[in-house]
Amino acid sequence: MSIVRIATFILSVFIVGMVEMMVAGIMNLMSHDLNVSEAVIGQLVTMYALTFAICGPILVKLTNRFAVRPVLLWTLFTFIIGNGIIAIAPNFTILVIGRILSSAAASLIIVKVLALTAMLTKPKNRGKMIGVVYTGFSGANVFGVPIGTMIGDWVGWRFTFLFIMAVSVLVGILMIIYLPKESELAHAN
């Protein structure tokens, strides 16, 4: 796999991980703006994880019969829309809808990206390469949450989600360029 493809996969896993945990760093800003308690805002992390866990297997089962490239691109688009809903949410209820949409899409993104990583890597290097791609998730906790918190503190919590959308658009462009075509997958290991 090319370095740029690997970087694209790492970045896609990074944004998924960042969205999950960054609420912790901007909880007080969200709470104040939406007029709900920090405890209620904190439940957004639980909602994300629960939706991720439930929707992941279901969405994988529903999408396995389709080509991975369009599924991944449409799923990323859904992820962007979900975060857009969060960014403009006038109240907590609308924010929850965006959060559920975002986390459902995230569950499929991470599974498809890790599956592609395995498919495009020689058997002897698969575990290592999956680990490399998954560093995006670890990096999201180490770097993504503080970045999201800084953005929230500087310009408001909504801009944190706009930042996620911008990075997601970049990932989408990279995916359009670097995701394998079906012919490449047919010849993959």
Features from the language model and the residues they span:
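Small-residue-rich segments within alpha-helical transmembrane domains of MFS-like 12-TM solute carriers
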Residues: 17, 21, 103-111, 142
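Residue-level signature of mid-helix packing/kink "hotspots" within the transmembrane helices
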Residues: 21, 49-57, 141-142
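MFS-fold secondary transporters
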Residues: 82-87, 102, 118, 175
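Helix-loop-helix hairpin linking two adjacent transmembrane segments in secondary transporters
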Residues: 94, 132-177
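Conserved MFS/SLC helix-loop-helix module at the cytosolic interface between two early adjacent transmembrane helices
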Residues: 54-93
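Extracytoplasmic
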Residues: 5-38, 56-59
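Cytoplasmic helix-loop-helix junction between adjacent transmembrane helices
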Residues: 98-136
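Flexible cytoplasmic inter-helical loops of multi-pass small-molecule transporters
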Residues: 177-189
